[in-house]
């Protein structure tokens, strides 16, 4: 009986690990384990904060549409907006961070996003973390 209980527990633990991404940090000797974030987990955030200026239905500033995975991966007139596994080099993340105003010349000019509610991510850091985790996890569809 103990043997079967052990096997059931082992299978349970193993199946939970499928929802994790393990990424070796190239600069350090540590391993980062992230929950798997998929684009569908970001659609409500983008719809509520970004679509009015960055969608095919609304307006498309700089040719950036955040209304589909394919459009995000295409990027904008300024080039890519996400670089998988590199949130600090991805405009989609960087332009939403509080540090963007201080370091905007490092990547691009312009305003912090969302433009109509620049403090949104200050008040909702878990939403910014979701974008970070999605990019760090490889921008999964």
What residues fall within each predicted segment?
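Sec-dependent N-terminal signal peptides
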Residues: 4-12
């Amino acid at each position: 009986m103990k043997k079967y209980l052990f096997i059931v527990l082992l299978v349970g633990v193993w199946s939970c690990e499928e929802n994790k991404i393990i990424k070796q940090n190239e600069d350090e000797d540590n391993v980062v384990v992230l929950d798997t974030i998929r684009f569908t987990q970001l659609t409500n955030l983008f719809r509520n904060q970004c679509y009015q200026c960055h969608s095919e239905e609304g307006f498309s500033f700089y040719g950036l549409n955040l209304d589909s995975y394919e459009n995000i991966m295409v990027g904008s007139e300024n080039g890519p907006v996400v670089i998988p596994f590199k949130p600090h080099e991805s405009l989609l993340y960087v332009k939403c961070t509080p540090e963007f105003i201080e370091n905007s010349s490092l990547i691009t000019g312009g305003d912090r996003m969302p433009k109509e509610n620049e403090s949104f991510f200050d008040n909702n850091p878990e939403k910014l973390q979701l974008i970070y985790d999605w990019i760090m996890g490889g921008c999964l569809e």
